[in-house]
């Protein structure tokens, strides 16, 4: 079977670096903004950098939001990266209160820490709850972050990994077939590639 991952293009992400990472591990992926192509895929990646309200507006413009909600709820492996993870939640307070995709319960809030914001650079993972995409990833593994907002979870059972930055910041979350990755796996060396390979192997 010719498995393929749809990387969603909605003008809010560094798509090529994500695709290159999948190419490197031998995973078949393609970049698209077409709902029909997304529906034909075997798994979905929602990358993203930028502001939450702009991202939701862009997803809604051509109905991609409804497509990915339906595909995720129907059990297709789905992962959001960085801003893409934050979009999975119910709403965000970034700029103005904006509703998200509502696939994982919780709200995106402005980071409160005595450390510099944005949280940018390498930080280590604590892993309180294993999940499929963290297979082979050890506690203390370093990954690369760039963000100023964090996920406040409605259900702590959705938390798989976090980092310490003056406060606990969720780094990996999941609910059934849906995963959120706050850091950039495509910029996180072998650990990041392991996580992307684990996602590919869910198909």
From Swiss-Prot:
Catalytic activity: 5-[(5-phospho-1-deoxy-D-ribulos-1-ylimino)methylamino]-1-(5-phospho-beta-D-ribosyl)imidazole-4-carboxamide + L-glutamine = D-erythro-1-(imidazol-4-yl)glycerol 3-phosphate + 5-amino-1-(5-phospho-beta-D-ribosyl)imidazole-4-carboxamide + L-glutamate + H(+); L-glutamine + H2O = L-glutamate + NH4(+)
Coiled-coil residues: none
GO MF annotations, alphabetized: glutaminase activity; imidazoleglycerol-phosphate synthase activity; lyase activity
InterPro entries linked: Class_I_gatase-like, GATASE, Imidazole-glycPsynth_HisH
Compartments where located: Cytoplasm
Pathway assigned in UniProt: Amino-acid biosynthesis; L-histidine biosynthesis; L-histidine from 5-phospho-alpha-D-ribose 1-diphosphate: step 5/9
Origin: domain of life: Bacteria
GO cellular component, one term: cytoplasm
EC number: 4.3.2.10, 3.5.1.2
Keywords: Amino-acid biosynthesis, Cytoplasm, Glutamine amidotransferase, Histidine biosynthesis, Hydrolase, Lyase
Keyword rRNA-binding: no
Any single GO BP term: L-histidine biosynthetic process
Chief location category: cytoplasm
Active-site residues, Swiss-Prot/TrEMBL: 82 (nucleophile), 184, 186
Any one Pfam family match given in the protein's UniProt record, by short name: GATase
Domain Glutamine amidotransferase type-1, chain residue ranges per copy: 4-203
PANTHER family hit by this protein: IMIDAZOLE GLYCEROL PHOSPHATE SYNTHASE SUBUNIT HISH
Function: IGPS catalyzes the conversion of PRFAR and glutamine to IGP, AICAR and glutamate. The HisH subunit catalyzes the hydrolysis of glutamine to glutamate and ammonia as part of the synthesis of IGP and AICAR. The resulting ammonia molecule is channeled to the active site of HisF.
Assembly mode: Heterodimer of HisH and HisF.
Protein name: Imidazole glycerol phosphate synthase subunit HisH
Annotated gene: hisH
